[in-house]
């Protein structure tokens, strides 16, 4: 399991260096539902990754084209709305109450969301 996390992290790094849009999100681990773990003040919030992308894509009042023209403003909107992203959590680890969400580099994880969101918004798939 540890090797899977290392491979996922390495894949994310390579994907960000040589980003090629892919129809299937690489944050989907097999068929498991994937949650993003946010920390907002003292509470942790787990939001399904696909639901978050859908919400960001449909919430035109908050996420307008101008708001994500650059990475910093998009990242700030995510932080303001949901808090800081701490890692990702799979359905099985969430259900078994194992506190072993995959802690990833915050910058890489949020950059990944940014790319995936742009691909959905501009239909680059």
Swiss-Prot record:
GO terms under cellular component: chloroplast
Domain of life: Eukaryota
Localization in the cell: Plastid, Chloroplast
This protein's UniProt keywords: Chloroplast, Plastid
Protein name: Uncharacterized 15.1 kDa protein
Species whose genome carries this gene: Guillardia theta
Lineage per the UniProt record: Eukaryota, Cryptophyceae, Pyrenomonadales, Geminigeraceae, Guillardia
